[in-house]
Curated annotation (Swiss-Prot):
Organism: Neisseria meningitidis serogroup A / serotype 4A (strain DSM 15465 / Z2491)
One GO MF term: uroporphyrin-III C-methyltransferase activity
Pathway per the UniProt entry: Cofactor biosynthesis; adenosylcobalamin biosynthesis; precorrin-2 from uroporphyrinogen III: step 1/1; Cofactor biosynthesis; adenosylcobalamin biosynthesis; sirohydrochlorin from precorrin-2: step 1/1; Porphyrin-containing compound metabolism; siroheme biosynthesis; precorrin-2 from uroporphyrinogen III: step 1/1; Porphyrin-containing compound metabolism; siroheme biosynthesis; siroheme from sirohydrochlorin: step 1/1
UniProt name for this protein: Siroheme synthase
Gene: cysG
Region (Precorrin-2 dehydrogenase /sirohydrochlorin ferrochelatase): 1-203
């Protein structure tokens, strides 16, 4: 974090602006909106600022900047056309430990101005830390289009009702759930349609009913996808933003975790084939206990919870204890990682089916049907199989799969560190030996297309259209690699 985001209350506070031209006028306009007492140090003012001075909306000092000007002000903005003067202002302000901004000179600023979406009292600031102002402006434009003009009205009405809600609903959790329901329900729709009187009646009715409603806990099983935060579903994002507590495993990426509601408790219940693990029974018991405490629990799992994620086992436990639950599917690793590696799971010329199998089974599980897995013209994807790659290759060859069958090991799928090692079934063990976990094994003729179709990360064979990726990032407002590249 290059800059700490903070909103300052400038109402009635003295702010010094050095300069009397168009640049200074733009900053002064914003300061006046915030209620600041603006003082302008300049020998001459342009027409716009002269009019403001004549109306006593700003205090014109009518002289060049002097060091004494900064002593009694809250913050300083240097916006003159004289670069040397601006930098002098900066150094003097720094010596007095006063916040100072030199317009268009990031190296001489103790604070910077973000792009702002104003839905007063709702304000959203967007900043690139001064690195890419145009990108920040484009993001602001996208957000402006997404956010309804009625957002400010919604905030104002909510502010008027805040004390009443606090008096009726005693716990923080109850109040948070109440407001989440209103902002996603009929109240919000009425405000959007400018029916504010009806909206307040709706709010009153909902508040009256709120204490009668069952506020018991629940569990939502959410698939986090293969890693890239941009692949998290909208429903999944909503769930982790509304959770009281999130139980997550080792396959959930940092990018996904950064989207979890900040006040939510996070509990790691991870497991990996090579390392320690949280017993599944302990995780099941924890979900039940937290839900019975009345908390909204999200069980966040890498990939899809019903594809080798033990999601079914966890839901059986919840059903047995009569805990309300829901499921949000996610993009499973076999789909996400192969797509990012440029390996289509099916192809009319090479594979008419795709089979997913796990290399990590229960001790008493029946043996795998190797004859079925060794069939040609199908794509075989093996989860958690890196430790058993030699055995897998041996058994498939014993049951008729050619040692020349293309094979790949994809590590850190869909993440910036993704690596795709390709070879054949004959050297699969060597490919897997050096692959960092989590790794996915892909076997089949479609792997041969990787060389031609790879588009992401270090294995990409050709340049993508940067403009397309930038547009996709801004259009989706995602947090995946496309946005990082932009």
């Amino acid at each position: 974090m290059n800059y700490f985001p903070i909103f300052a209350n400038l109402a009635g506070r003295p702010v010094l602006v050095v300069g009397g031209g168009a640049v200074a006028a733009r900053k002064i306009s914003l300061l006046l909106k915030a209620g600041a007492e603006v003082r302008v140090a300049a020998k001459h003012l342009n027409a716009e600022l002269s009019a403001l001075a004549a109306e006593n909306k700003i205090l014109w000092l009518a002289e060049e900047f002097r060091a004494e000007h900064i002593r009694t002000v809250f913050l300083i903005i240097a916006a003159s056309s004289d670069q040397a003067l601006n930098r002098r202002v900066f150094h003097l302000a720094e010596s007095c430990q006063k916040p100072v901004n030199v317009v268009d000179d990031r190296d001489h600023c103790s604070f910077i101005f973000p792009s702002v979406i104003d839905r007063n009292p709702v304000q959203i600031a967007v900043s690139s830390s001064g690195s890419a102002p145009v990108l920040a402006r484009l993001l602001r434009e996208r957000l402006e289009a997404l956010l309804p003009p009625s957002l400010g009205d919604m905030a104002e009405i909510s502010g008027r009702w805040r004390d009443a809600v606090k008096g009726k609903l005693k716990s923080v959790t109850e109040r948070r759930r109440f407001w989440e329901k209103q902002f996603n329900g009929r109240f919000a729709a009425l405000v959007k349609n400018r029916q504010n009187t009806l909206a307040e009646r709706e709010l009153a009715g909902q508040l009256e009913q709120s204490r009668q409603n069952d506020q018991g806990g629940s569990v939502s099983l959410v698939g986090a996808g293969p890693g890239d935060a941009g692949l998290l579903t909208l429903k999944g994002l909503q769930e982790i933003q509304q959770a009281d507590v999130v139980l997550y495993d080792a396959l959930v990426s940092d990018g996904i975790l950064s989207l979890v509601r900040r006040d939510a408790e996070r509990i790691f219940v991870g497991k990996r084939a090579r390392g320690g693990r949280t017993p599944q029974e302990d995780t099941n018991a924890l979900m039940v206990r937290l839900a019975r405490e009345g908390r909204r629990v999200v069980r966040l799992k890498g990939g899809d919870p019903f594809v080798f994620g033990r999601g079914g086992e966890e839901l059986e436990t919840l059903a047995r204890h009569q805990i309300p639950f829901s499921v949000v599917p996610g993009i499973t690793a076999a789909v996400g990682a192969t797509a990012y590696a440029g390996i289509p799971l099916t192809h009319r010329d090479y594979a008419q089916s795709a089979v997913f199998v796990t290399g990590h089974r229960k001790a008493d599980a029946p043996d795998i049907e190797w004859q079925t897995l060794a069939r040609s013209r199908q794509t075989l994807v093996i989860y958690m199989g890196a430790l058993k790659a030699a055995l897998i290759a041996e058994r498939l060859q014993q049951h008729g799969r050619s040692p020349d069958t293309p094979a790949a090991v994809i590590s850190q799928g869909t993440l910036p560190a993704q690596k795709t090692a390709t070879g054949t079934l004959a050297n699969l063990a060597e490919l897997a030996e050096t692959a960092p976990n989590p790794a996915l094994i892909v076997i089949g003729e479609v792997v041969g297309l990787h060389e031609k179709l790879a588009w992401f990360g270090e294995n990409a064979k050709k340049e993508s259209n940067p403009a397309e990726h930038a547009y996709f990032a801004l259009d989706g407002l995602g947090t995946g690699q496309e946005q990082q590249a932009a």
